[in-house]
Amino acid sequence: MVHPLPVFKRYTGNTHQKKAIFGQCRGLPCVAPLLTTVEEAPRGISARVWGHFPKWLNGSLLRIGPGKFEFGKDKYNHWFDGMALLHQFRMAKGTVTYRSKFLQSDTYKANSAKNRIVMSEFGTLATPDPCKNVFERFMSRFELPGKAAAMTDNTNVNYVRYKGDYYLCTETNFMNKVDIETLEKTEKVDWSKFIAVNGATAHPHYDPDGTAYNMGNSFGPFGFSYKVIRVPPEKVDLEETTHGAQVICSIAPTEKGKPSYYHSFGMTRNYIIFIEQPLKMNLWKIATSKIRGKAFSDGISWEPQCNTRFHVVDKHTGQLLPGRYYSKPFVAFHHINAFEDQGCVIIDLCCQDNGRILEVYQLQNLRKAGEELDQVYNSAGRSFPRRFVLPLNVSLNAPEGDNLSPLSYTSASAVKQADGTIWCSHENLHQEDLEKEGGIEFPQIYYGQFSGKKYRFFYGCGFRHLVGDSLIKVDVVNKTLKVWREDGFYPSEPVFVPVPGTNEEDGGVILSVVITPNQNESNFLLVLDAKNFEELGRAEVPVQMPYGFHGTFIPI
């Protein structure tokens, strides 16, 4: 049954509960229930629909994130460690059903069988097997982190597509192929069986023909390198997974013993853009982490004395372009978009000047309350959209000090230095009002039509809390915002779904899963008109859900 959309309480400004002054907050509500273990709901639950869901909106919103944070007496330390919980909101002719299932990864099954944490995760070192003797437990510390058997297959970050099939992935060498109808794992895939990489990102890019590109790492006896990966669009055999994948370019790290940690990369029609940022992975610390009784995350540190470097690769030839582009230190977890214009690559990112966010996402921090929670939030960096310009054809005769950007519509500059490098200064794609929203993350665009092209709009979550507390539409041309927020609710990454056949950049709807720590309220799937950012409807589900990471919409 569909119900008229009632008037819900919204934030219209600062309240006595929360006061935001340029990122400084007091009185943040505790969100610990959003970061605790929940039960799966494998049988479809009919949602109570308020307002309306467009009749053309037929398909499934798939989401994934951590949903279990302990086994027996063992507890995970970091938000990124929780066991993968798959969510499905299925929409058909205005009705909505929900289900969720824990991914039956080898890690999940081994932990469940032993009732303890058997496999180490990003921020948690597995406990030694109590059934082994002292010598066996000691020797188990010497298994290298890069070895496939030592890596988790708890793929809890994103759904990705290769050759028409969907996979769950994180940043290790393992992916899990999934049946998007049943949410059941069908196959475990190891990247390293096909190409020489130890892992790849959870944010590949796609050409219109389905060719996929990704960034990975190679870590072995010959050192460390970043890898650009290409996966062909078509299967030769129905049983294929990532067969035919190729490494088309290898990039040596600027600092051999301390390569950069990265979460995503950029792509235009012709180029891959990879950013080496001063969030460093200390290879010695990582290689000796088990011996020292430390988790993988102990080997990652923010080193703001180092600048950020941009690498540009021709994705057709695999050639690394000679330009040496640098900027002041920042961290970017998510790229917004990138495109080419007048001999330049323009790249838009969500950037933070404080790279300690991985430390902030320790579960003990996220679950704090009162003044301690305020202190954690106020110590964290904020993420803001910035534009950089990378001129591709730099003349050796270009005078030192010249701004090499020919683009009149951006204040981003690229200035040639005496040593031939190019110093890139960004343009802010926002005004002061976004600072009052706590910045923005989880950026999304109309990917199918505007990825790698000049664009105007993107969508994301505002962060006046440690998790997203609003949805925001950003106009990067006029630098204006539209905001949706509701008191006591926390929306997930927005997913843009276009009206069938449209080429309009905001011609469609935004889907977001909105959850609350209040046990007397229902979580819901929200649908907004992407143009005016007004609510069209919501589908309430009386099921506890944790705050997750990423997802995708798959039309029927």
Swiss-Prot record:
User: Is Lipid metabolism there in the keyword field?
Assistant: yes
Major enzyme class: oxidoreductase
- Which keywords are on file for this protein? Dioxygenase, Iron, Lipid metabolism, Metal-binding, Mitochondrion, Oxidoreductase
Specify whether Mitochondrion is a keyword of the entry: yes
Which residue ranges traverse the bilayer?
Answer: none
The cofactor remark states:
Binds 1 Fe(2+) ion per subunit.
Q: What is its main location?
A: mitochondrion
- Protein name per its UniProtKB record: Carotenoid-cleaving dioxygenase, mitochondrial
Biological process (GO) annotations held by this record are: carotene catabolic process; carotene metabolic process; lutein catabolic process; lycopene catabolic process; retinal metabolic process; xanthophyll catabolic process; zeaxanthin catabolic process
Where is this protein found?
A: Mitochondrion
Query: Which family, according to UniProt?
Result: Belongs to the carotenoid oxygenase family.
What's the Enzyme Commission number for this chain?
1.13.11.-, 1.13.11.71
Q: Which GO terms describe its molecular function?
A: 9,10 (9', 10')-carotenoid-cleaving dioxygenase activity; beta,beta-carotene-9',10'-cleaving oxygenase activity; beta-carotene 15,15'-dioxygenase activity; metal ion binding; oxidoreductase activity, acting on single donors with incorporation of molecular oxygen, incorporation of two atoms of oxygen
Q: Where does Fe cation bind?
A: 203, 263, 334, 550
Provide GO CC annotations from the record.
mitochondrion
What function is annotated for this protein? Broad specificity mitochondrial dioxygenase that mediates the asymmetric oxidative cleavage of carotenoids. Cleaves carotenes (pure hydrocarbon carotenoids) such as all-trans-beta-carotene and lycopene as well as xanthophylls (oxygenated carotenoids) such as zeaxanthin, lutein and beta-cryptoxanthin at both the 9,10 and the 9',10' carbon-carbon double bond. Through its function in carotenoids metabolism regulates oxidative stress and the production of important signaling molecules.
Tell me the cofactors it needs.
Fe(2+)
Catalytic activity annotation? all-trans-beta-carotene + O2 = beta-ionone + all-trans-10'-apo-beta-carotenal; 5-cis-lycopene + O2 = 5-cis-10'-apo-lycopenal + (3E,5E)-6,10-dimethylundeca-3,5,9-trien-2-one; 13-cis-lycopene + O2 = 13-cis-10'-apo-lycopenal + (3E,5E)-6,10-dimethylundeca-3,5,9-trien-2-one; lutein + O2 = (3R,6R)-hydroxy-alpha-ionone + (3R)-3-hydroxy-10'-apo-beta-carotenal
